[in-house]
């Protein structure tokens, strides 16, 4: 199980990404249509003033059950350990053991 502080930090990042998504998208659109070097530099400065944790690239996928950051399966939102346990218990509809 991941530390509570790491899970909360990740939740805070998700809130910041959602809060600043429109502002960031607007600035990037302005950057694409900017013509002069001064405009480009000004827009870059505005982007740099946004909180660092509001960048989507700083998000890390975590298991919703354990908070584990590695071995994450997007389809389920679970890490491999939790996925295995829940599949064995029959808690994931449509998931069956493979046999060939």
Curated annotation (Swiss-Prot):
Domain of life: Bacteria
GO cellular component terms, A-Z: cytoplasm; small ribosomal subunit
BP GO terms, sorted: translation
Family: Belongs to the universal ribosomal protein uS14 family.
HAMAP family in UniProt: Ribosomal_uS14_1
Assembly, per entry: Part of the 30S ribosomal subunit. Contacts proteins S3 and S10.
Protein name as it appears in the record: Small ribosomal subunit protein uS14
